[in-house]
Amino acid sequence: SCNLDCRTKKGMALYRVANWYYDGGNKAMSVQARELAGKFAPYCRNRWNMREDAWYIDPACKALRKELELYGIDALNADNNAHDIRGSTKGIKVGIEYTQNMIQDGCFFLVEDETYGHIDFLKEIGMYCVDEHGNPVDAYNHAMDELRYSINHFVKQYMY
């Protein structure tokens, strides 16, 4: 997604202004990389008059990082909470807690965009669930993982 970190009267906030939905089952990785580098990134730069400071990709998606390198994009591994501990909370649950807190505290906003909107995000957030042990179900979660990665970066950059 394209996220803007903004200073507000209440402090820092994360604005999700455009979304590229990754679905490896429907497009080849090379096509995804070409569209990200050739369409999505230029769109975000022009639409929001921005220059990205970094690209973060799911650590499990090495193929996409390699494909993006072909377009001159040096993508970094996103923080997936693999080693996080916060009190008695560990791993992915730390990132989920950060995400819940950001939403509850009014520090995360969706800004609708006609070209790269958030429909997949909105669908997934309604399907996100946990199993009987409180662990997130690993299904319908591409957008939720990406949200968590964005919030991890934001929280660790501005809040801790």
Label each region the model flagged:
Residues 10-136, 157-158:
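Mg2+-dependent endonuclease catalytic cores in nucleic-acid-processing enzymes, primarily RNase H-like
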Residues 152-160:
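Acidic two-metal-ion nuclease catalytic site recognized across multiple nuclease folds
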Residues 149:
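Active-site or metal-binding loop neighborhoods of secreted/extracellular toxin and effector enzymes
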Residues 1-7:
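Gly/Thr-rich phosphate-binding beta-strand-loop-beta motif of the actin/hexokinase/Hsp70
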